[in-house]
Amino acid sequence: MGVLGPKVIKVPSDASDDGSAPYKIVDNKLSPLSDADLVFIDPIGTGYSRAIGCHDSEEFWGVSEDPKIIAEFIRRWINDNKRWNSPRYILGESYGGIRGPLLVSELRSGSITPIEVNGLLLVAPASDYQYLVFHPGNNSPHYGFFPSYAATAYYHGKVETDKSLQEFYEDSKNFSLEVYGPALLKGTRISDEHKKSVMKQYSEFTGLSLRFVEDYDMRVDAYSFMKELLRDEGFSVGRLDSRYKNSDYMAGGQYPDTDVSSEGFMSAYVSAIHTWFGEIGVEMKMLYQSGDNEVYSNWKHPQEWKGNDFGYVNTVPDIARAQRYNKDFKVYVSCGLYDLATPCFTAENFMNDNTVDMSRVVFSEFEAGHMMYNHEPSF
Protein backbone atom coordinates (compact mmCIF):
# COMPACT_ATOMS: atom_id res chain seq x y z
CA MET A 1 0.00 0.00 0.00
CA GLY A 2 3.04 2.26 0.07
CA VAL A 3 4.73 1.91 -3.31
CA LEU A 4 4.46 -1.45 -5.13
CA GLY A 5 0.81 -2.48 -5.16
CA PRO A 6 -1.85 -1.62 -7.74
CA LYS A 7 -3.38 0.69 -5.13
CA VAL A 8 -1.48 2.95 -2.73
CA ILE A 9 -2.38 5.14 0.19
CA LYS A 10 -1.65 8.83 -0.18
CA VAL A 11 -0.55 10.56 3.01
CA PRO A 12 0.49 14.23 3.16
CA SER A 13 3.79 14.68 1.37
CA ASP A 14 4.72 17.73 3.43
CA ALA A 15 5.10 15.83 6.75
CA SER A 16 1.78 17.01 8.13
CA ASP A 17 -0.50 14.69 10.10
CA ASP A 18 -2.73 12.22 8.23
CA GLY A 19 -5.71 13.06 10.44
CA SER A 20 -8.70 10.73 10.52
CA ALA A 21 -10.54 8.60 7.96
CA PRO A 22 -11.51 8.68 5.17
CA TYR A 23 -8.05 8.42 3.63
CA LYS A 24 -7.19 8.65 -0.04
CA ILE A 25 -6.46 5.33 -1.81
CA VAL A 26 -5.44 5.78 -5.44
CA ASP A 27 -4.38 3.73 -8.47
CA ASN A 28 -0.63 3.18 -8.67
CA LYS A 29 0.43 3.70 -12.28
CA LEU A 30 4.03 2.83 -11.34
CA SER A 31 3.25 -0.60 -9.91
CA PRO A 32 5.44 -3.32 -11.48
CA LEU A 33 2.58 -5.84 -11.22
CA SER A 34 2.13 -5.95 -15.00
CA ASP A 35 5.74 -7.10 -15.40
CA ALA A 36 6.33 -9.30 -12.35
CA ASP A 37 4.61 -11.38 -9.71
CA LEU A 38 4.61 -9.50 -6.40
CA VAL A 39 4.62 -11.93 -3.48
CA PHE A 40 4.35 -10.27 -0.07
CA ILE A 41 5.23 -12.56 2.82
CA ASP A 42 4.11 -11.71 6.34
CA PRO A 43 6.39 -13.38 8.90
CA ILE A 44 4.48 -15.56 11.34
CA GLY A 45 2.73 -13.47 13.94
CA THR A 46 2.24 -10.52 11.59
CA GLY A 47 -0.30 -9.78 8.86
CA TYR A 48 -2.53 -12.84 8.51
CA SER A 49 0.30 -15.33 9.13
CA ARG A 50 -0.16 -17.62 12.13
CA ALA A 51 1.38 -20.90 13.25
CA ILE A 52 -0.97 -23.87 12.94
CA GLY A 53 -1.20 -27.40 14.26
CA CYS A 54 1.10 -28.22 17.16
CA HIS A 55 3.31 -25.21 16.50
CA ASP A 56 3.36 -21.91 18.36
CA SER A 57 4.13 -18.64 16.58
CA GLU A 58 6.95 -17.88 18.99
CA GLU A 59 8.92 -20.83 17.61
CA PHE A 60 9.57 -18.77 14.48
CA TRP A 61 10.41 -15.45 16.14
CA GLY A 62 14.12 -14.83 15.91
CA VAL A 63 17.02 -13.66 13.78
CA SER A 64 17.97 -17.23 12.89
CA GLU A 65 14.51 -18.83 12.92
CA ASP A 66 12.75 -16.26 10.73
CA PRO A 67 14.62 -16.71 7.39
CA LYS A 68 14.35 -20.50 7.55
CA ILE A 69 10.55 -20.57 7.50
CA ILE A 70 10.33 -17.79 4.89
CA ALA A 71 12.83 -19.59 2.63
CA GLU A 72 10.70 -22.73 2.88
CA PHE A 73 7.64 -20.70 1.87
CA ILE A 74 9.50 -19.31 -1.16
CA ARG A 75 10.67 -22.75 -2.29
CA ARG A 76 7.15 -24.10 -2.11
CA TRP A 77 5.68 -21.06 -3.91
CA ILE A 78 8.20 -21.37 -6.74
CA ASN A 79 7.48 -25.06 -7.09
CA ASP A 80 3.69 -24.78 -6.85
CA ASN A 81 3.62 -22.00 -9.44
CA LYS A 82 6.21 -23.59 -11.75
CA ARG A 83 8.54 -20.58 -11.64
CA TRP A 84 11.88 -22.36 -11.25
CA ASN A 85 13.43 -20.58 -14.23
CA SER A 86 12.12 -17.09 -13.53
CA PRO A 87 14.30 -14.22 -12.22
CA ARG A 88 13.92 -13.72 -8.46
CA TYR A 89 14.41 -10.56 -6.44
CA ILE A 90 13.98 -10.05 -2.70
CA LEU A 91 12.91 -6.71 -1.25
CA GLY A 92 13.20 -5.89 2.43
CA GLU A 93 12.53 -2.68 4.33
CA SER A 94 14.03 -1.69 7.69
CA TYR A 95 14.45 -5.01 9.56
CA GLY A 96 14.26 -6.46 6.07
CA GLY A 97 17.89 -5.36 5.93
CA ILE A 98 18.56 -8.23 8.35
CA ARG A 99 16.00 -10.68 6.98
CA GLY A 100 16.82 -10.13 3.28
CA PRO A 101 20.53 -11.04 3.28
CA LEU A 102 19.91 -14.00 5.61
CA LEU A 103 17.13 -15.16 3.31
CA VAL A 104 19.47 -15.01 0.31
CA SER A 105 21.94 -17.22 2.20
CA GLU A 106 19.21 -19.58 3.38
CA LEU A 107 17.91 -20.05 -0.16
CA ARG A 108 21.41 -20.65 -1.51
CA SER A 109 22.20 -23.19 1.20
CA GLY A 110 19.47 -25.70 0.35
CA SER A 111 21.29 -29.02 0.05
CA ILE A 112 18.65 -30.43 -2.31
CA THR A 113 17.06 -27.30 -3.77
CA PRO A 114 19.58 -24.42 -3.75
CA ILE A 115 18.08 -21.24 -5.21
CA GLU A 116 20.15 -18.31 -6.44
CA VAL A 117 18.60 -14.86 -6.22
CA ASN A 118 19.14 -12.26 -8.95
CA GLY A 119 19.13 -9.29 -6.65
CA LEU A 120 18.36 -7.76 -3.28
CA LEU A 121 16.48 -4.49 -2.87
CA LEU A 122 16.96 -2.85 0.53
CA VAL A 123 14.76 0.04 1.64
CA ALA A 124 16.11 1.96 4.65
CA PRO A 125 18.00 -1.16 5.75
CA ALA A 126 19.06 -2.05 9.29
CA SER A 127 21.66 -4.59 8.15
CA ASP A 128 24.45 -4.00 10.69
CA TYR A 129 23.42 -3.14 14.23
CA GLN A 130 26.88 -1.88 15.12
CA TYR A 131 26.05 1.22 13.08
CA LEU A 132 22.58 1.65 14.59
CA VAL A 133 22.77 0.92 18.33
CA PHE A 134 23.95 3.71 20.64
CA HIS A 135 26.01 1.87 23.26
CA PRO A 136 28.85 3.30 25.36
CA GLY A 137 32.10 2.73 23.52
CA ASN A 138 30.42 2.24 20.14
CA ASN A 139 31.18 5.30 18.02
CA SER A 140 29.84 3.92 14.73
CA PRO A 141 26.28 5.27 15.05
CA HIS A 142 27.52 8.69 16.14
CA TYR A 143 29.35 9.46 12.92
CA GLY A 144 26.77 7.49 10.90
CA PHE A 145 23.77 9.46 12.17
CA PHE A 146 25.52 12.82 12.04
CA PRO A 147 24.70 13.76 8.40
CA SER A 148 21.01 13.07 9.05
CA TYR A 149 21.16 15.35 12.08
CA ALA A 150 22.60 18.00 9.78
CA ALA A 151 19.93 17.46 7.11
CA THR A 152 17.21 17.68 9.77
CA ALA A 153 18.63 20.90 11.17
CA TYR A 154 18.78 22.30 7.63
CA TYR A 155 15.14 21.40 6.99
CA HIS A 156 13.95 23.10 10.18
CA GLY A 157 16.00 26.25 9.58
CA LYS A 158 18.44 25.70 12.44
CA VAL A 159 21.66 26.24 10.49
CA GLU A 160 23.20 29.27 8.82
CA THR A 161 24.23 28.43 5.27
CA ASP A 162 23.72 29.59 1.71
CA LYS A 163 24.30 26.10 0.34
CA SER A 164 21.68 23.76 -1.06
CA LEU A 165 20.51 20.83 1.04
CA GLN A 166 22.54 18.39 -1.05
CA GLU A 167 25.70 20.49 -0.81
CA PHE A 168 25.25 20.90 2.94
CA TYR A 169 24.58 17.19 3.37
CA GLU A 170 27.70 16.25 1.42
CA ASP A 171 29.75 18.64 3.54
CA SER A 172 28.37 17.01 6.68
CA LYS A 173 29.33 13.55 5.38
CA ASN A 174 32.86 14.73 4.64
CA PHE A 175 33.12 16.27 8.10
CA SER A 176 31.86 13.09 9.72
CA LEU A 177 34.24 10.86 7.77
CA GLU A 178 37.35 13.03 7.79
CA VAL A 179 37.08 15.00 11.05
CA TYR A 180 34.38 13.84 13.47
CA GLY A 181 34.89 10.07 13.16
CA PRO A 182 38.68 10.25 13.66
CA ALA A 183 38.16 12.61 16.62
CA LEU A 184 35.89 10.05 18.28
CA LEU A 185 38.48 7.35 17.68
CA LYS A 186 41.10 9.40 19.53
CA GLY A 187 38.97 9.40 22.67
CA THR A 188 40.80 11.02 25.58
CA ARG A 189 43.93 11.29 23.41
CA ILE A 190 42.42 14.23 21.53
CA SER A 191 43.88 17.64 22.41
CA ASP A 192 41.64 20.23 24.06
CA GLU A 193 42.11 22.61 21.15
CA HIS A 194 41.21 19.99 18.55
CA LYS A 195 38.18 18.83 20.53
CA LYS A 196 36.87 22.38 20.89
CA SER A 197 37.20 22.86 17.13
CA VAL A 198 35.33 19.63 16.37
CA MET A 199 32.54 20.43 18.84
CA LYS A 200 32.12 23.92 17.39
CA GLN A 201 31.71 22.49 13.89
CA TYR A 202 29.36 19.80 15.24
CA SER A 203 27.19 22.54 16.72
CA GLU A 204 27.18 24.54 13.48
CA PHE A 205 26.17 21.53 11.37
CA THR A 206 23.43 20.25 13.69
CA GLY A 207 21.88 23.42 15.10
CA LEU A 208 22.47 22.16 18.64
CA SER A 209 23.97 24.59 21.12
CA LEU A 210 27.67 24.28 21.81
CA ARG A 211 26.89 23.76 25.50
CA PHE A 212 24.62 20.82 24.66
CA VAL A 213 27.29 19.24 22.44
CA GLU A 214 29.86 19.70 25.20
CA ASP A 215 27.55 18.17 27.81
CA TYR A 216 27.16 15.09 25.60
CA ASP A 217 30.90 14.91 24.91
CA MET A 218 29.99 15.32 21.21
CA ARG A 219 28.13 11.96 21.33
CA VAL A 220 24.45 12.84 20.95
CA ASP A 221 22.14 9.86 20.53
CA ALA A 222 19.18 10.06 18.15
CA TYR A 223 16.42 10.40 20.75
CA SER A 224 18.23 13.21 22.55
CA PHE A 225 18.69 15.00 19.24
CA MET A 226 15.00 14.55 18.39
CA LYS A 227 14.04 16.22 21.67
CA GLU A 228 16.64 18.97 21.70
CA LEU A 229 16.69 20.40 18.16
CA LEU A 230 13.38 22.29 18.44
CA ARG A 231 13.11 22.41 22.22
CA ASP A 232 13.18 26.21 22.16
CA GLU A 233 10.06 26.11 19.96
CA GLY A 234 8.30 23.52 22.13
CA PHE A 235 8.57 20.66 19.61
CA SER A 236 10.26 17.30 19.13
CA VAL A 237 11.03 15.92 15.66
CA GLY A 238 10.19 12.49 14.28
CA ARG A 239 12.36 9.38 14.18
CA LEU A 240 11.14 7.66 11.01
CA ASP A 241 10.87 11.06 9.33
CA SER A 242 12.47 14.02 11.05
CA ARG A 243 10.54 16.52 8.94
CA TYR A 244 7.60 15.87 11.27
CA LYS A 245 7.35 17.86 14.49
CA ASN A 246 4.91 18.06 17.38
CA SER A 247 4.75 19.04 21.02
CA ASP A 248 5.24 16.61 23.91
CA TYR A 249 3.26 16.45 27.14
CA MET A 250 6.10 18.40 28.73
CA ALA A 251 8.76 20.46 26.98
CA GLY A 252 11.30 19.26 29.54
CA GLY A 253 12.82 15.82 29.65
CA GLN A 254 15.51 14.04 27.68
CA TYR A 255 13.45 12.13 25.11
CA PRO A 256 10.26 12.68 23.05
CA ASP A 257 6.99 11.12 24.21
CA THR A 258 6.66 9.16 20.98
CA ASP A 259 7.74 9.10 17.35
CA VAL A 260 5.63 11.92 15.95
CA SER A 261 6.23 10.73 12.38
CA SER A 262 4.72 7.30 13.12
CA GLU A 263 1.72 9.08 14.60
CA GLY A 264 1.57 11.08 11.38
CA PHE A 265 0.81 8.26 8.93
CA MET A 266 0.29 4.83 10.52
CA SER A 267 -3.48 5.13 10.88
CA ALA A 268 -3.82 5.76 7.15
CA TYR A 269 -1.87 2.60 6.28
CA VAL A 270 -3.89 0.38 8.63
CA SER A 271 -7.16 1.72 7.25
CA ALA A 272 -5.98 1.37 3.65
CA ILE A 273 -4.89 -2.26 3.89
CA HIS A 274 -8.17 -3.39 5.47
CA THR A 275 -10.22 -1.34 2.99
CA TRP A 276 -8.38 -2.68 -0.06
CA PHE A 277 -8.56 -6.29 1.08
CA GLY A 278 -12.30 -5.89 1.53
CA GLU A 279 -12.70 -4.49 -1.97
CA ILE A 280 -10.88 -7.41 -3.60
CA GLY A 281 -12.81 -10.03 -1.66
CA VAL A 282 -10.37 -11.06 1.05
CA GLU A 283 -12.70 -12.28 3.79
CA MET A 284 -10.90 -12.81 7.10
CA LYS A 285 -12.31 -12.80 10.61
CA MET A 286 -8.95 -11.82 12.08
CA LEU A 287 -7.50 -8.34 11.68
CA TYR A 288 -4.40 -7.73 9.60
CA GLN A 289 -1.65 -7.46 12.22
CA SER A 290 0.47 -4.51 11.09
CA GLY A 291 2.53 -4.58 14.29
CA ASP A 292 2.69 -6.59 17.51
CA ASN A 293 4.57 -5.71 20.68
CA GLU A 294 4.55 -9.38 21.66
CA VAL A 295 6.57 -10.22 18.55
CA TYR A 296 9.01 -7.38 19.20
CA SER A 297 9.57 -8.22 22.86
CA ASN A 298 10.01 -11.96 22.23
CA TRP A 299 12.16 -11.73 19.11
CA LYS A 300 15.33 -13.72 19.71
CA HIS A 301 18.59 -11.88 19.05
CA PRO A 302 21.27 -14.50 19.73
CA GLN A 303 24.21 -13.34 21.83
CA GLU A 304 26.38 -15.70 19.89
CA TRP A 305 26.40 -14.31 16.37
CA LYS A 306 28.47 -16.40 13.99
CA GLY A 307 31.08 -17.28 16.58
CA ASN A 308 31.39 -13.81 18.08
CA ASP A 309 29.92 -13.93 21.60
CA PHE A 310 29.69 -10.17 21.90
CA GLY A 311 29.02 -9.16 18.31
CA TYR A 312 26.25 -7.00 16.87
CA VAL A 313 23.92 -8.66 14.39
CA ASN A 314 25.42 -8.02 10.96
CA THR A 315 24.14 -9.58 7.74
CA VAL A 316 26.14 -7.53 5.25
CA PRO A 317 28.73 -10.34 4.90
CA ASP A 318 25.87 -12.47 3.54
CA ILE A 319 25.53 -9.92 0.73
CA ALA A 320 29.25 -10.08 -0.02
CA ARG A 321 29.12 -13.89 0.01
CA ALA A 322 26.22 -13.94 -2.45
CA GLN A 323 28.19 -11.65 -4.77
CA ARG A 324 31.27 -13.85 -4.65
CA TYR A 325 29.37 -16.98 -5.67
CA ASN A 326 26.82 -15.45 -8.04
CA LYS A 327 28.19 -13.18 -10.76
CA ASP A 328 24.70 -11.84 -11.54
CA PHE A 329 23.75 -10.87 -7.97
CA LYS A 330 23.16 -7.12 -7.58
CA VAL A 331 21.99 -4.85 -4.77
CA TYR A 332 19.86 -1.71 -4.68
CA VAL A 333 19.76 0.46 -1.54
CA SER A 334 17.33 3.34 -1.06
CA CYS A 335 17.25 5.65 1.94
CA GLY A 336 15.89 8.97 3.16
CA LEU A 337 17.98 11.92 4.32
CA TYR A 338 15.52 12.56 7.17
CA ASP A 339 15.53 9.00 8.50
CA LEU A 340 16.70 8.92 12.13
CA ALA A 341 16.04 5.19 12.49
CA THR A 342 18.29 3.82 9.74
CA PRO A 343 20.12 6.84 8.29
CA CYS A 344 21.59 6.92 4.80
CA PHE A 345 25.17 7.35 5.93
CA THR A 346 24.99 4.30 8.22
CA ALA A 347 23.95 2.21 5.21
CA GLU A 348 26.75 3.70 3.15
CA ASN A 349 29.21 2.89 5.93
CA PHE A 350 28.23 -0.70 6.58
CA MET A 351 28.04 -1.51 2.87
CA ASN A 352 31.59 -0.21 2.45
CA ASP A 353 32.85 -1.97 5.57
CA ASN A 354 32.08 -5.63 4.78
CA THR A 355 33.96 -6.54 1.54
CA VAL A 356 30.90 -5.87 -0.62
CA ASP A 357 31.62 -5.32 -4.32
CA MET A 358 30.32 -1.75 -4.53
CA SER A 359 30.39 -1.83 -8.34
CA ARG A 360 27.29 -4.01 -8.07
CA VAL A 361 25.51 -1.78 -5.57
CA VAL A 362 23.28 1.16 -6.52
CA PHE A 363 22.46 3.79 -3.88
CA SER A 364 19.53 6.20 -4.06
CA GLU A 365 19.10 9.01 -1.53
CA PHE A 366 15.78 10.83 -1.22
CA GLU A 367 14.74 14.04 0.52
CA ALA A 368 12.37 12.05 2.69
CA GLY A 369 12.31 9.73 5.68
CA HIS A 370 12.34 5.99 6.42
CA MET A 371 9.32 5.44 4.15
CA MET A 372 10.54 7.67 1.36
CA TYR A 373 7.57 6.78 -0.86
CA ASN A 374 5.38 8.88 1.46
CA HIS A 375 7.10 11.88 -0.13
CA GLU A 376 5.41 12.49 -3.48
CA PRO A 377 8.51 13.76 -5.37
CA SER A 378 10.49 10.73 -4.13
CA PHE A 379 7.68 8.35 -5.10
Which stretches of residues belong to each language-model region?
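Glycine-rich nucleophile elbow surrounding the catalytic serine of serine-hydrolase chemistry
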Residues: G92-S105
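Alpha/beta-hydrolase fold catalytic core
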Residues: G187-C335, L340-A341
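A catalytic-pocket lid/entrance helix-loop region that shapes and gates access to the active site
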Residues: V104, R108-E204
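Alpha/beta-hydrolase active-site loop
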Residues: P43, F60-D80
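Alpha/beta-hydrolase fold nucleophile elbow
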Residues: K82-Y95
